[in-house]
Amino acid sequence: MKGTLLLLGLLVTGELSFQTTEACLPFFEGYASVLSGSRVWLYQELQAFNATAEEKVALEKIQDCFSEERIRNILLEPKIMEAMVASPECLSYYGLDNIRSILDYISKLLGE
């Protein structure tokens, strides 16, 4: 299900005529907030996108799913996220220094 949600997010981004490189960081900020298990962080990210009440409830449910397999998600999902953020497209758009600082910040937040 998580892979499906990721694919759906990427497809929607493409259909809305955004460059996926422009959407890299906002997507991963939201993704990291879901992985974190922190409702406060999740609400902060959703506020930036003016999320509706229904969207908040849906993402809370997704966050609960991630929390069920907490150990696996702490170990595996950040590695997947890091691989995607460090994609050649994101690196060329944001620059290596920006990506490094973002990855360091995400690692700190996730307690790695």
UniProtKB/Swiss-Prot annotation:
Keywords associated with the record: Allergen, Glycoprotein, Secreted, Signal
InterPro entries according to UniProt: CH2-like (IPR015332), Secretoglobin (IPR016126), Secretoglobin_Domain_sf (IPR053723), Secretoglobin_sf (IPR035960)
Transmembrane spans: none
Expressed in which tissues: Expressed in lacrimal gland, at higher level in males than females. Expressed in the submandibular gland.
Signal peptide: 1-23
Residues bearing glycans: N50
Pfam families named among the record's database cross-references: Feld-I_B (PF09252)
Family: Belongs to the secretoglobin family.
Record's protein name: Secretoglobin family 2B member 20
Organism name: Mus musculus
